[in-house]
Curated annotation (Swiss-Prot):
It comes from Cyanophora paradoxa. This is Allophycocyanin subunit beta-18. SUPFAM superfamilies: Globin-like. The gene is apcF. Keywords: Antenna complex, Bile pigment, Chromophore, Cyanelle, Electron transport, Membrane, Methylation, Photosynthesis, Phycobilisome, Plastid, Thylakoid, Transport. Belongs to the phycobiliprotein family. Gene3D superfamilies: Phycocyanins (1.10.490.20). The keyword Cell membrane does not apply. Heterodimer of an alpha and a beta chain. (2R,3E)-phycocyanobilin binds at residue 82. Light-harvesting photosynthetic bile pigment-protein from the phycobiliprotein complex. Allophycocyanin has a maximum absorption at approximately 650 nanometers. GO terms for cellular component: cyanelle thylakoid membrane; phycobilisome. It comes from the Eukaryota. It is found in: Plastid, Cyanelle thylakoid membrane.
Amino acid sequence: MKDAITSLIATYDVTGKYFDDNAVDTLNAYFSTASARIESVKIINANVSTIIKTAASALFDEQPELIAPGGNANTTRRYAACLRDIDYYLRYATYAIISADVDVLDERVLDGLKETYNSLGVSIAPTVRAIELLKNTSKELIKAAGISAVDFIDEPFDYMGKVLADSSL
């Protein structure tokens, strides 16, 4: 798992270059948002149950066929698996928020997920929507706590949603 700094160093190391102005700007951006990223993750961690419950409730309200007979979250086992997966996306999003790098999402979440879901007959579209709901709920809580610059929250959630949506074509 990499973070923004180790990724930057690796890029410059491979090319044998010293940091240029772009590298310094990247480092400044990383450090200037560090406190807000840490505080945001603290808020998410303190509200995991609420975030998951809110996102799942909204998803099932929007798509009741998921919990209807024959739906992918109909049985207790499938419903629990759905909630487990939603929790998984949220947890790894927090890792990406702290590291300011989405590599962990590829390594630990996205690689092979489409194939797994397809083999189980699970639609990708509700997963993408659940990730969007996690993002929205998290941002609301973070903004309510007084952290106004929260654009960095979007990156991991949007990245997961885009990769999954693109992979389902």
